[in-house]
């Protein structure tokens, strides 16, 4: 595995790989690697001959009162994990290399980025869209793998790639989970043992919502409210939001229609730690009580 810190050097390497007809896959991370990240690397490895992993704690996607300065940065451990996972190139630039003096460009993506995480974390998705676009331009991959845990981020990236005609295939990878259903996340290290156990209620509650949809419920707004109540009751955590969106448009949805797919998303505070998760439901072609 070769570690690269200079964007120009990384671009040069990728250009040579492309000239050699090597299929390039990229996995973008902020470090603090865990088994979820490794699963993304494995998926990239299945589809590409060369895998690039990026580690960059992006300052522009953190709000003023968020955890940028204390976000874990165990670089040596991350590098060892990346090497053992079969990563070919580790791209780990400093902030000044990505945002040099005079940098003044930002990408905004209206619509999908305006609700939920976008509403709760102003400027977050602009930071995400900008750094992802830069990293795509630097690594020049044929495909980029992102986890479904950050479902809204995935939707934003897909929108940006489509709107800006970026020639890359966006691949979604399923969420890795701990034994109690808690979505694997770098921020889970902040949780106490008790919080970690209680956090299993998030996934149980989302699954319960999908079960109710499968049983014929169609009122998504009411079901989201009931799910928020269940999460709070079973975990003792403060719920930031629970909401349904249409899977195709990622716009808010209040009633399930036949033949449509919906995603329920939740954000929860376990003490001062913010956890997010989601689950997808594919509606049958007929829903009880709905006219054909």
Swiss-Prot record:
Its EC number is 6.3.2.1. The active site is at 37 (proton donor). GO terms for molecular function: ATP binding; pantoate-beta-alanine ligase activity. ATP binds at residues 30-37, 147-150, 184-187. InterPro entries: Cyt_trans-like, Pantoate_ligase, Pantoate_ligase_C, Rossmann-like_a/b/a_fold. Beta-alanine binds at residue 61. One of its GO terms (biological process) is pantothenate biosynthetic process. It is found in: Cytoplasm. Keywords: ATP-binding, Cytoplasm, Ligase, Nucleotide-binding, Pantothenate biosynthesis. The keyword ATP-binding applies. It is an enzyme of class 6 (ligase). GO terms for cellular component: cytosol. It catalyses: (R)-pantoate + beta-alanine + ATP = (R)-pantothenate + AMP + diphosphate + H(+). (R)-pantoate binds at residues 61, 153. Gene3D superfamilies: HUPs, Pantoate-beta-alanine ligase, C-terminal domain. Coiled coil: none annotated. It comes from the Bacteria. Pathway: Cofactor biosynthesis; (R)-pantothenate biosynthesis; (R)-pantothenate from (R)-pantoate and beta-alanine: step 1/1. PANTHER family: CYTIDYLATE KINASE/PANTOATE-BETA-ALANINE LIGASE (PTHR21299), PANTOATE--BETA-ALANINE LIGASE (PTHR21299:SF1). Belongs to the pantothenate synthetase family. Catalyzes the condensation of pantoate with beta-alanine in an ATP-dependent reaction via a pantoyl-adenylate intermediate. The reaction proceeds by a bi uni uni bi ping pong mechanism. Homodimer. This is Pantothenate synthetase.
